Amino acid sequence: MKLNTKYHGSIEYEERDVIYFEKGIPGFEELNKFIIFPVEDNEVFLVFHSIENEDIGIIVTSPFNIEKDYEIQLEEEQITNLKLQDEKDALVLNTVTLDSDIDKITVNLRAPIIINIKEKIGEQIIINSDKYKVKHPLFKEEA
């Protein structure tokens, strides 16, 4: 199958690549089917893209690229919804807010996207804690 994206050109994917989000994601509750693909010539960022709306693609990254000790505790209901049997089946991604000023690029560490890579289902959760920021700087200033 082929997805013609607004910013990333034509992307080939297969049905097995599609990740289903029963509730959509905050702000896009009506969109349930997404794929993930790499940003060209970039090892840090991925694109989390709707296959139902060619204009909706979000840059994401692994939180472990930003915070090596990143840790979240899923509630029992979230584990059940995601059908997670083993934590190694969970892929954790966080949304990135881009800016032309590299120092203003931020990562939302408080609302991770959790994907069961075995079952191909996902959910974006909100962490009810001040431990992580919604606008965490991607690049920290050197002291």
Swiss-Prot record:
GO BP: bacterial-type flagellum assembly; regulation of translation
Signal peptide limits: none
SUPFAM superfamilies named in the record: BH3618-like
InterPro entries: Flagellar_assembly_factor_FliW, Flagellar_assmbl_FliW_dom_sf
Keywords: Bacterial flagellum biogenesis, Chaperone, Cytoplasm, Translation regulation
Alphabetical list of Pfam families matching this protein: FliW
Localization in the cell: Cytoplasm
An annotated GO cellular component: cytoplasm
Biological role stated in the UniProt entry: Acts as an anti-CsrA protein, binds CsrA and prevents it from repressing translation of its target genes, one of which is flagellin. Binds to flagellin and participates in the assembly of the flagellum.
Family the UniProt entry places it in: Belongs to the FliW family.
Known partners and oligomeric status: Interacts with translational regulator CsrA and flagellin(s).
Protein name, entry field: Flagellar assembly factor FliW
The species this protein was found in: Clostridium botulinum (strain 657 / Type Ba4)
Gene expressing this chain: fliW
